[in-house]
């Protein structure tokens, strides 16, 4: 396997090095070809490296900085003033080809702003999109984009999102011709606003995207499609609502299984199965949102991710780097534009 280097914003997120460094060590154990650059306060990072094995330490580099982008920093402010922050330096390592991807659990708005300015978008891409996968009843992931990078989008941007989401699904899941749908208020062709209607027209006229039509919100988790496209306003609300419902279901299930002696006894008998179901619904299992459409790979972890969840984000970055995702998106867009022009 070709060696890969990842840059980690070690200070990002609610827990900083307490989570990012142990997760990095676990990633190195899993991937013998991997090298990791930890960007952040060396004194804090070293605390979590004291007991690490020598063969793992040999594949770790630390770039020291004591500047951090806070969760309260506005994106423009962070972009202008946090020029030596752990987040920015990690992205710059990707820009300068010192790393093939970067991962951060820090301020989402600042991460998107810095990544777009420092890495630039790919040719044929107007705006990058934030995408993540969701669970489905078929036990295969469903990719949803955009999750908030772009509050409003025109039809051309939605079309580009569909292309990028399709390529991502092919790259990460090795799925041939993934099914792509536009999230809408109905499945009928007459439904939806102008942007969605026009995006549908664009998608219907390219054979390189397996476009299946509109999909409604109640079908998101059906597994009938592989990629669901919408603007960032709709996508972010959809994601947050889904996470809230998952928490509600877990709460109600736990409360229901502790009421009454017989129910508690029954709960103990089926506890392993319940735990397996709850694990599938846990957002940490799907941690890692990709900012796609850029000339480099950037993965956003949940800010409150634990070690296992952060490891999932690292693994996603590794997979995207192995598949050379930006190059795949660039090639597909060029091919589609060539078909349209002919």
From Swiss-Prot:
One of its GO terms (biological process) is phospholipid biosynthetic process. It is an enzyme of class 2 (transferase). One of its GO terms (cellular component) is cytoplasm. It is found in: Cytoplasm. Keywords: Cytoplasm, Lipid biosynthesis, Lipid metabolism, Phospholipid biosynthesis, Phospholipid metabolism, Transferase. Catalyzes the reversible formation of acyl-phosphate (acyl-PO(4)) from acyl-[acyl-carrier-protein] (acyl-ACP). This enzyme utilizes acyl-ACP as fatty acyl donor, but not acyl-CoA. Belongs to the PlsX family. Homodimer. Probably interacts with PlsY. This is Phosphate acyltransferase. It comes from Shewanella baltica (strain OS223). The gene is plsX.
């Amino acid at each position: 396997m070709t060696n890969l280097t990842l840059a980690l914003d070690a200070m990002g997120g609610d827990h900083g090095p307490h989570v990012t460094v142990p997760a990095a060590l676990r990633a190195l154990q899993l991937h013998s070809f991997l090298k990791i650059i930890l960007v952040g306060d060396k004194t804090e990072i070293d605390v979590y490296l004291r007991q690490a094995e020598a063969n793992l330490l040999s594949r770790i580099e630390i770039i020291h900085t004591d500047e951090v982008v806070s969760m309260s920093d506005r994106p423009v402010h962070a972009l202008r003033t946090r020029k030596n922050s752990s987040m920015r330096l990690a992205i710059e390592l990707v820009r300068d080809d010192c790393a093939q991807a970067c991962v951060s659990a820090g301020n989402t708005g600042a991460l998107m702003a810095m990544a777009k300015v420092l890495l630039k978008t790919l040719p044929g891409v107007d705006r990058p999109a934030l995408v993540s996968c969701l669970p489905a009843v078929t036990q295969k992931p469903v990719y949803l984009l955009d999750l908030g990078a772009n509050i409003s989008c025109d039809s051309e941007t939605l079309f580009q999102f569909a292309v990028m989401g399709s390529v991502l699904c092919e790259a990460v899941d090795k799925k041939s011709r993934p099914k792509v749908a536009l999230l809408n208020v109905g499945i009928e062709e007459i439904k939806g606003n102008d942007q969605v209607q026009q995006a549908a027209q664009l998608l219907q006229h390219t054979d390189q995207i397996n476009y299946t039509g509109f999909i409604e919100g109640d079908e998101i988790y059906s597994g009938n499609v592989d990629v669901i496209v919408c603007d960032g306003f709709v996508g972010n609300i959809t994601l947050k609502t889904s996470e809230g419902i998952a928490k509600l279901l877990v709460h109600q299930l736990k409360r229901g299984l502790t009421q009454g002696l017989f129910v508690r006894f029954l709960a103990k008998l089926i506890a392993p199965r319940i735990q397996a179901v709850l694990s599938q619904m846990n957002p940490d299992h799907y941690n890692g949102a990709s900012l796609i459409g850029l000339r480099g790979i950037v993965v956003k972890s949940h800010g409150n991710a634990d070690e296992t969840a952060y490891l999932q984000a690292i693994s996603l970055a590794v997979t995207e780097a192995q598949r050379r995702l930006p190059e795949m998106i660039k090639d597909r867009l060029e091919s589609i534009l060539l078909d349209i022009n002919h």
